[in-house]
């Protein structure tokens, strides 16, 4: 039996796919840079070997699954080609894997990971379901009928998939290093839609998604009355959100989610619509929606002392706006402080004013240096260009996060798609030291 070797196994999709193959009984190993990523925890728990990149890792008998961040000139891929080993790109392998399942591809400019996680949680509790989530979580469930997968639009990789269903959460212009306009993004989504076998569930409040012309039914969901599935009577509370769902103007049921913001209502509505279409019991769907704890790096909350720290993947103006609004719903009486690390120079330059406008919805703004991607290490833009447009013109360094101590009782949002977590980790150490120091002072005062 072949051993599957993942080049770039710590990538979020790659880590999830490796876990799926492992669960299905295959031998799996992989390699990556010698740096800790949150995605490797699950790999280590399943005892999947992780090596540091080296051509010496590549031997006879391996099948290579190559991450899309790595070119054909990568040392391991070159060695594999020299040995005439099979080399398959991640998205192409996944496209082959989902055949034979009732597959559900979740895509959209924003909300893919959260919606895939929610769908996997709900459907997986009702019927056997395998899933691949973009937070590095994957499961190859035995006897699975369904396969839920996050489908990334970047470089049109999702066109390797021919799913049974697709959920399209929205269309927005992102990845400006590849997509030239929102029309370019739309064309990619419509092409995917034409490969779907059974039905597409699309946000009907989205102007771009309303333009879709497909051969399969399009089931629209949203807040507007023109949608087949409509969310009404939304009640936003500090413990979550309640709403009613109407199907073709007929009351379906009332639902409750432990999540915040309109975007999470819409994510849930897409899952409700698909479950209804598949005939899954509405009472079970209601029950599972109430217990979803979220996915990694999506409004992940840590309470330290009197402050609330939130880790979130938001890296586009629309996502930052949604995260700030969600924080205001859950913590209406607290100050909101945004700590943001822009991801890629191209995206930062393209959406500079949009970033400023979204960040300024927070009460205070702190900016980290721009995180260059593997494809783009430098640019002729600096973080100062964005700082000049935001409240306070604050730039924060990893070694000086103590500046955030001046906001007691605040919610600190650490946002970005790079390694903004290291800023939160540094600040948590500062907070721990502060808490210990305060305890010492209290004891001294008592004595």
From Swiss-Prot:
Stretches assigned to coiled coil: none
Catalytic activity of the protein: UDP-N-acetyl-alpha-D-muramate + L-alanine + ATP = UDP-N-acetyl-alpha-D-muramoyl-L-alanine + ADP + phosphate + H(+)
InterPro entries: Mur-like_cat_sf (IPR036565), Mur_ligase_C (IPR004101), Mur_ligase_C_dom_sf (IPR036615), Mur_ligase_cen (IPR013221), Mur_ligase_N (IPR000713), MurCDEF_pg_biosynth (IPR050061), UDP-N-AcMur_Ala_ligase_MurC (IPR005758)
GO MF annotation, one: ATP binding
Subcellular localization: Cytoplasm
Principal location: cytoplasm
EC class name: ligase
Pfam families for this protein: Mur_ligase, Mur_ligase_C, Mur_ligase_M
E.C. number(s) listed in UniProt: 6.3.2.8
Binding-site positions, ATP: 108-114
GO cellular component, one term: cytoplasm
GO biological process: cell division; cell wall organization; peptidoglycan biosynthetic process; regulation of cell shape
Family designation: Belongs to the MurCDEF family.
Name of this protein: UDP-N-acetylmuramate--L-alanine ligase
Organism: Listeria innocua serovar 6a (strain ATCC BAA-680 / CLIP 11262)
Organismal lineage: Bacteria, Bacillati, Bacillota, Bacilli, Bacillales
């Amino acid at each position: 039996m072949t051993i599957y070797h993942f080049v770039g196994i710590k990538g979020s999709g790659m880590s999830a796919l490796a876990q799926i193959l492992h669960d299905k009984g295959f031998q799996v190993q992989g390699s990556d840079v010698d740096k800790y990523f949150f995605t490797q925890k699950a790999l280590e728990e399943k005892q999947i070997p992780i090596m540091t990149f080296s051509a010496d890792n590549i031997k006879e008998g391996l099948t290579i699954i190559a991450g899309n961040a790595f070119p054909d000139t990568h040392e391991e891929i070159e060695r594999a080609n020299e040995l005439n080993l099979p080399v398959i790109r991640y998205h192409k392998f996944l496209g082959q894997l989902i055949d034979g399942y009732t597959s559900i591809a979740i895509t959209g400019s924003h909300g893919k990971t959260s919606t895939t996680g929610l769908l996997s949680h709900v459907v997986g509790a009702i019927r056997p379901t395998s899933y691949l989530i973009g937070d590095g979580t994957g499961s190859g469930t035995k006897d699975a009928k369904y396969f839920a997968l996050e489908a990334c639009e970047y470089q049109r990789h999702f066109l390797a998939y021919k799913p049974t269903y697709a959920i399209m959460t929205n269309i927005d212009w992102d990845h400006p290093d590849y997509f030239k306009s929102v029309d370019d993004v739309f064309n990619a989504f419509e092409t995917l839609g034409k490969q779907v076998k059974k039905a597409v569930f699309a946000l009907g409040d989205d102007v771009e998604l309303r333009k879709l012309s497909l051969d399969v039914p399009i089931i629209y969901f949203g807040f507007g009355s023109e949608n087949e599935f409509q969310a009404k009577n939304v009640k936003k509370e500090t413990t979550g959100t309640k709403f009613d769902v109407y199907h073709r103007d007929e009351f379906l049921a009332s639902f409750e989610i432990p999540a915040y913001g309109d975007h999470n209502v819409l994510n849930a509505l897409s899952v409700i619509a698909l479950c209804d279409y598949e005939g899954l019991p509405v009472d079970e769907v209601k029950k599972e929606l109430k217990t979803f704890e979220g996915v990694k790096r999506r409004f992940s909350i840590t309470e330290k002392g009197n402050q609330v720290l939130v880790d979130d993947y938001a890296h586009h103006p629309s996502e930052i706006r949604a995260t700030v609004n969600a924080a205001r719903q859950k913590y209406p009486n607290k100050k909101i402080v945004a700590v943001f690390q822009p991801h890629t120079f191209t995206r930062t330059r393209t959406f500079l004013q949009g970033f400023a406008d979204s960040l300024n919805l927070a009460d205070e703004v702190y900016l980290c240096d721009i995180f260059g991607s593997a494809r783009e290490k430098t640019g002729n833009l600096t973080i100062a260009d964005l700082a000049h447009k935001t409240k306070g013109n604050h730039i924060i360094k990893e070694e000086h996060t103590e500046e955030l101590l001046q906001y007691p009782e605040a919610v600190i949002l650490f946002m970005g798609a790079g390694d903004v977590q290291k800023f939160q980790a540094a600040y948590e150490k500062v907070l721990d030291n502060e808490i210990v120091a305060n305890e010492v002072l209290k004891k001294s005062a008592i004595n």
